From Swiss-Prot:
The protein's name: ATP-dependent dethiobiotin synthetase BioD
Quaternary structure note: Homodimer.
Reaction(s) catalysed by this chain's protein: (7R,8S)-7,8-diammoniononanoate + CO2 + ATP = (4R,5S)-dethiobiotin + ADP + phosphate + 3 H(+)
Annotated positions binding substrate: T42
Biochemical pathway: Cofactor biosynthesis; biotin biosynthesis; biotin from 7,8-diaminononanoate: step 1/2
GO CC annotations on file: cytosol
Main function: Catalyzes a mechanistically unusual reaction, the ATP-dependent insertion of CO2 between the N7 and N8 nitrogen atoms of 7,8-diaminopelargonic acid (DAPA, also called 7,8-diammoniononanoate) to form a ureido ring.
Cofactor: Mg(2+)
Organism: Baumannia cicadellinicola subsp. Homalodisca coagulata
Length: 225
């Protein structure tokens, strides 16, 4: 049976894509046919092959199954803003059924999937629709990426509470050091380990000079249910 996980973050720009790539590398290293899925992406570069979003390209390059770009990222919008604003600017709508249809395609080709969301847990996709509504519909186990900075404890606890209020399982969290580590960072990490009722499955250091291809060592999939 295919293992499926949804990646959310305490905020935008906390390293969800980096964490998703690390998870894919770790899964591949222990024999899985692993794929990344970015159903909705905003902001792209127009190439000879069409619109391409950098986050989706990263997931595609870190998967070890053969997928087309449109399978990894079926919905891409020009404006680099919240999905509900970006799609409205193009006169389009996001249907949750489209996200589910894309997920089924990925499931047919892989046995381990990481689905990367957009922004945080309550990111809107349209009028009265949140990204988390779709996660709830699919009953996806959730992995929380925490950008290690001042305020992250509050953001993490609020997000964890919101996930559980949906009746969903927070199966693990990843600490991503989005700035050079300080003494305070270690205090934040210790407090999060004490307060979050989920295992720490990854601790990714400040990676200013470390190749992105070498991320698997920062992930412990043994802790992931």
């Amino acid at each position: 049976m295919t293992k499926r996980y949804f990646i959310t973050g305490t905020d935008t720009n906390v390293g969800k894509t980096l964490a998703a790539c690390a998870l894919l590398q770790a899964a591949i290293s222990i024999g899985y046919h692993a794929a990344g899925y970015k159903p909705v992406a905003t902001g792209y570069q127009l190439t000879l092959d069409g619109p391409r979003n950098n986050d989706a390209l990263a997931l595609l390059s870190n998967s070890n199954v053969i997928l087309s770009y449109s399978q990894v990222n079926p919905l891409v919008f020009s404006e680099p803003t919240s999905p509900h604003i970006a799609c409205r600017a193009e006169g389009r709508n996001i249907e949750l059924s489209e996200l589910s249809a894309g997920l089924k395609v990925i499931e047919q080709k892989s046995d381990w999937i990481v689905v990367e969301g957009a922004g945080g847990w309550f990111t809107p996709l349209g009028e009265g629709i949140l990204y988390s509504d779709w996660v709830n519909y699919e009953k996806l186990p959730v992995i929380l990426v925490i950008g290690m900075k001042l305020g992250c404890i509050n953001h993490a606890l609020l997000t964890a509470l919101a996930i559980r209020q949906f009746g969903l399982q927070l199966v693990g969290w990843i600490a991503n050091h989005i700035q050079p580590t300080t003494t305070w960072s270690q205090h934040y990490l210790a407090e999060l380990r004490n307060r979050l009722d989920a295992p720490l499955i990854g601790d990714i250091p400040w990676l200013s000079n470390i190749p992105v291809a070498l991320l698997a060592k920062y992930i412990n999939l043994a802790e992931l249910s």
